[in-house]
Amino acid sequence: MTNEELAKEIALGIIKTGVEGSYGSVSCSTAGDYPSMGVSQWEGLGGRGDLLLSYLDGGSYFAGRSYSDIKYRGELPALKALLESKQGQIAQQMILAQDCLDRYVPQLKRVPTLDDSRCFIYAGIWCPTSEYVVRQFLTNRFTRCNLRSLEALKNLFKDEYYIGAGVGEIYKDGYANRAENTYYYVAGIDLTTPYGVPIYGEAGNGR
């Protein structure tokens, strides 16, 4: 698979597993009074959230505004509907795929032995937590974990990622559930029809 194809599938995985949010997600950023929007919680008020809005008919109405202003005017449902529209979904897929291509794929390419397509996509779906942490986590463990095995990779994230990410026991169960859900998603996607990747379980290296 090409870098662009890998980025596209990572983006779809992030969206379909809902690890960051849904198309219509709108919340107040923890960093300030501006909205965090969509499947990657892009932030508005001059950030990438405003870039997303610029692609949408009527999006300019919400661009550059604080979360509290939108909320107190009772316009959160309208913003949510705009993000959930077909146009909103396509724009989010496009921006997220570009983010994956620019940020996640280059970092994962630096991990030794991470050259199976499904395993690469699996790791990519974890990258919103921090692509740098994911890269270092896998690089530190590739000599004792088969990164070409989707099941082994799942168990590694399930058992150890909360340690590698330095977030403590409070995230252990949540990360374990995320590891399982992501595993079942990636194991079930069809990479054979569009890309010619061998069916899952029939080849050790699918890229």
Where are these regions (language model features)?
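Cell-wall polysaccharide-cleaving catalytic domain and substrate-binding groove, primarily
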Residues: M1-P112, S117-F120, G124-R207
